[in-house]
Amino acid sequence: MLKAVILIGGPQKGTRFRPLSFEVPKPLFPVAGVPMLQHHIEACSKLPNMKEILLIGFYQPNEELNRFLSCAQQDFKISIRYLQEYAALGTGGGIYHFRDQILSGGPDAFFVMNADVCSEFPLPEMLDFQKEHGDTYSFVILGTTANRKQSLNYGCIVENEQTDEVLHYVEKPGTFVSDIINCGIYLFTPEIFQHIGSVFQKNQQEMLLEEQSNGWHRAEVIRLEQDIFTALAGQGKLYVYKTDRFWSQIKSAGSAIYASRLYLNQYHKTHPERLATNTEGGAKTRGNVYIHPTANIDPTAVLGPNVSIGTGVTIGAGVRVRESIILHGATLQDHSCVLNSIVGWESTIGKWARVEGTPSDPNPNDPYAKIDSETLFRDGKLTPSITILGCNVNIPSEVIILNSIVLPHKDLNRSFKNQIIL
């Protein structure tokens, strides 16, 4: 029997995803037409022995989360529960705090995955890989190859090339350690809790010595990467399964468009029915496009490649949309143009207006390049990135919004370039 745990974080996390995370918890943001988390849940539900999926985070239970959970349970016919942490306990602290719920029913193994990654989720391959190593005490990290420079932004894994054992693990090293990076997807057996428990006890001893008033809470904050993997490396217990299939983090809003492209591409294999096709009297599409059935699109509009159109969106005559996500209820009036942008819920773009951003894609000439997490400002200037309109933004006719971030509920009256409009 298997279980899966998805770590969804909380409202203090995902700040780089603002202003989109103001309206909806980041894990529920739609990527390729469905909430980010749904891709994880679907991959888990396809495993034959999967009995339960647990979401762990510190969001207050809210209507959106509850609605998503009840819909997902019906769609995937699997038990899905949300366990709320009382505070941010770290990637290891959360699963240790809820260890009784994870272990109830006696699972042989369980997956732990971060919500903010997009991947093909090679979960069956990870299970086979663990069986090949034949040791029920072994734990598996999903790894992939990055280029030397970008590897410094991730957890780096030094492996034994013959056995795939993790010999050394360093989280975000200061100098180059290895080009194999941690993908944030793990396969554990219940024995992992012994290792987390010993770190917890060690933390408690240190707290007692320090005589801190909030020592109990601090002892429970445990990070899988720094506290557990670093200690387990080289002990014959930790292995890395390397994948060459697509994988990316979804940290910034710009990376959501890139993740959307990867998932839309995957739909050819997994969900061809989700991809729009050119039909007589329908909108013209180029490349991979997702259109929600409730969207109203003029047949003279041209969409794609890499576009997803949400519920109740209205798109007028002669509109051009490319490399963008258009969210619920937005209106794109006649002859407007949207490139490399995310248009927020219920926003309106006037006639002949142009909303354009700069793509933050990985270097296409480097097969191992990952998406860069650019800082918001460089040399005192806003780094060019995709344009984001928060919810309920009104763009008047015939203006240009370029490389800008517009916070919710703004009525603009002129063009803007390289600005954050508060």
UniProtKB/Swiss-Prot annotation:
Instruction: Describe the protein's quaternary organization and the partners it interacts with.
Output: Component of the GMPPA-GMPPB mannose-1-phosphate guanylyltransferase complex composed of 4 gmppa subunits and 8 gmppb subunits; the complex is organized into three layers, a central layer made up of 2 gmppa dimers sandwiched between two layers each made up of 2 gmppb dimers.
Protein's UniProt name: Mannose-1-phosphate guanylyltransferase regulatory subunit alpha-A
Q: What is known of its domains?
A: The N-terminal substrate-binding domain adopts a Rossman-like fold and has a binding pocket for GTP or GDP-alpha-D-mannose. The C-terminal domain consists of a series of tandem hexapeptide repeats that adopt a beta-helix conformation. The beta-helix forms several protein interaction surfaces involved in assembly of the GMPPA-GMPPB mannose-1-phosphate guanylyltransferase complex. A loop extending from the C-terminal domain (C-loop) is involved in interaction with other subunits of the GMPPA-GMPPB complex and may be involved in allosteric inhibition of gmppb catalytic activity by gmppa.
Pathway this chain belongs to:
Nucleotide-sugar biosynthesis; GDP-alpha-D-mannose biosynthesis; GDP-alpha-D-mannose from alpha-D-mannose 1-phosphate (GTP route): step 1/1
Question: Which source organism does the UniProt entry give?
Answer: Danio rerio
Spell out the InterPro entries in the cross-references: GMPPB_C, Hexapep_transf_CS, Mannose-1P_guanyltransferase, NTP_transferase_dom, Nucleotide-diphossugar_trans
Could you tell me the keywords of this UniProt record?
GTP-binding, Nucleotide-binding, Nucleotidyltransferase, Transferase
Example GO molecular function term? mannose-1-phosphate guanylyltransferase (GTP) activity
Its biological purpose: Regulatory subunit of the GMPPA-GMPPB mannose-1-phosphate guanylyltransferase complex; reduces the catalytic activity of GMPPB when part of the complex. Mediates allosteric feedback inhibition of GMPPB catalytic activity upon binding GDP-alpha-D-mannose. Together with GMPPB regulates GDP-alpha-D-mannose levels. One of two paralogs (gmppaa and gmppab) that may have redundant functions.
**Which residues bind GDP-alpha-D-mannose per the record?**
85, 249
| Gene of this entry | gmppaa
Phenotypic consequence of gene deletion = Morpholino knockdown of both gmppaa and gmppab results in muscle damage and shortened motor neurons.
Region of interest (Substrate-binding domain), residue spans: 2-253
